[in-house]
Amino acid sequence: MSKAIVKIDEFIKLSKSEEVLPSAFTRMKSVRVSTVDKIMAKENDNISEVDLLKGVKLVKNGYVCLVGLVVSGEWNLPDNCRGGVSICLIDKRMQRHNEATLGSYTTKASKKNFSFKLIPNYSITSQDAERRPWEVMVNIRGVAMSEGWCPLSLEFVSVCIVHKNNVRKGLREKVTAVSEDDAIELTEEVVDEFIEAVPMARRLQNLRKPKYNKEKENKNLNNKNSIGVSKPVGLERNKVRSVVRKGVRSDSSLGVTDMSQDGSSSEISSDSFI
């Protein structure tokens, strides 16, 4: 069913023999089409994991190239509803937000269904592919729907190439040029007044930011508490010296515990300042 939805020749330029002969006798035997993976978008500014290689048998200790994918959307709304959506494909391995955004698409809710394609065209190891490195960020705006309902359904099908060795396969992939500064931006023609004001890379940065700040705040709080409990070694030693100077015998009857000379009780790890 997925192969009926996706036309491989839209992503890979086939030779005459590859169009006629069975794939087992050509280089097309390494090309795979995934089964459909679905996402039900219920929340605004939500990041969901997507399995772009669903149903694809990977090569052990090999590689997989995500040549391209087709994304189809269906609005679960009455006709002529206001609002719209921005959809962004993310590689969650990447830490720089402009490099993590592989491509985005914007459309209005009045367009009942839509479909678009992206061409990432890069390879990852089979081991990384099993960890599902791709996510989808969905930003629904201006749709007046009560919480808990699903205004939008998304389906994903990908075309990929699996291979054992990281050597050029000879397949001439259709590559879309991407500038160094910006990711691929696709926008439906019907979009006029619905304009995406915030770049997708900046939106992704804002979504990731609260989680990082919360973890940092908790870490600093724990370090602060641990510093307050420990007693400075120098103060304890000064107390002992003052008792001896007054002529009081410093034996076990004083109840003074012997402290280690390395002062480990008040030592602060450099990790506390990270």
Swiss-Prot record:
Localization: Host cytoplasm, Host cytoskeleton; Host cell junction, Host plasmodesma
Keywords: Host cell junction, Host cytoplasm, Host cytoskeleton, RNA-binding, Transport, Viral movement protein
Record bears the keyword RNA-binding: yes
Domain of life: Viruses
Biased composition (Low complexity): 250-274
GO CC, alphabetical: host cell cytoplasm; host cell plasmodesma; host cytoskeleton
InterPro entries: TMV_movement, Viral_movement
GO molecular function: RNA binding
GO biological process: transport of virus in host, cell to cell
Region annotation (Disordered) ranges: 209-274
One Pfam family named in its UniProt record: MP
Family statement drawn from the similarity comment of this UniProt entry: Belongs to the tobamovirus movement protein family.
Job description of the protein: Transports viral genome to neighboring plant cells directly through plasmosdesmata, without any budding. The movement protein allows efficient cell to cell propagation, by bypassing the host cell wall barrier. Forms a ribonucleoprotein complex with viral RNA. Binds microtubules and modulates microtubule stability. Can bind double-stranded DNA.
Name of this chain's protein: Movement protein
Natural source organism: Tobamovirus Ob
